[in-house]
């Protein structure tokens, strides 16, 4: 009987710890509307690990990854390894979702998903994969999404590349650092990868 009670208490503690990682009504990495009045020591950029889920546009992925790495961020890459037209959208989504699961297990500081394409056929599996990231307390940024998830609680920001480097764009590394540190930011950010 005592073992059952201890197991029940342990399960309750696990559930509470998971719930504590998810902000109410806000996406992980998008909870601040203003900078705190008291300065704090935040995560140093060399301690930020980025889980980068690739897209079918490997050239664009390479530019983004190189820009992140050039700014001393540690990037782990999950390639979709597609062979072209023979790959179905569902298989591509499943491969990307497996990469997300791997990054949660690796405990990265942020997950970037390049070219996400949420369709009616894969909506539930995307929602589940992104919910798992949310419950782990890891922010998600969508880079050049084709179709983003409807639930905006599943991602902190959309990053759109602006390689013309207009006055409105920021470096992709600066955007990622801002999201990771949970500093105030727009929901859609123009980023430069060059």
Where are the regions that the model predicts?
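Glycine-rich, charge-decorated loop segments at or immediately adjacent to ligand/cofactor-binding or catalytic sites
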Residues: 142-161
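Bacterial signal peptide processing site
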Residues: 19-26
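Extracellularly exposed regions in secreted/surface proteins, prominently low-complexity, repeat-rich
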Residues: 156-194
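Short beta-strand elements in bilobed, periplasmic/extracellular small-molecule ligand-binding domains
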Residues: 70-86
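Catalytic-core regions built around general acid/base machinery
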Residues: 122-140
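Short beta-strand elements of ligand-binding domains
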Residues: 112-114, 137-148
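Short, well-structured alpha-helical segments in soluble
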Residues: 95-109, 129
């Amino acid at each position: 009987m005592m073992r059952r009670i201890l197991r029940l208490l342990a399960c309750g503690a696990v559930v509470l710890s998971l719930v504590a990682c998810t902000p109410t009504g806000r996406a992980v990495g998008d909870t601040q509307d203003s900078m705190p009045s008291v300065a704090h020591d935040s995560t140093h950029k060399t301690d930020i690990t980025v889980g980068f889920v690739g897209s079918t546009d490997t050239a664009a992925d390479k530019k983004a990854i190189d820009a992140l790495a050039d700014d001393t961020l540690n990037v782990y890459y999950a390639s979709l390894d597609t062979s072209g037209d023979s790959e179905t959208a569902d298989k591509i989504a499943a491969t990307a979702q497996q990469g997300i699961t791997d990054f949660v297990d690796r405990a990265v500081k942020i997950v970037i998903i390049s070219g996400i394409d949420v369709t009616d056929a894969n909506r539930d599996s995307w929602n589940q994969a992104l919910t798992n990231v949310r419950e782990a307390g890891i922010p998600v940024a969508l880079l050049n999404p084709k179709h983003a998830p409807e639930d905006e609680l599943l991602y902190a920001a959309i990053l759109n590349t602006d390689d013309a480097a207009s006055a409105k764009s920021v470096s992709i590394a600066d955007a990622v650092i801002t999201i990771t540190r949970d500093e105030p930011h727009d929901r859609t950010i123009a980023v430069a990868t060059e």
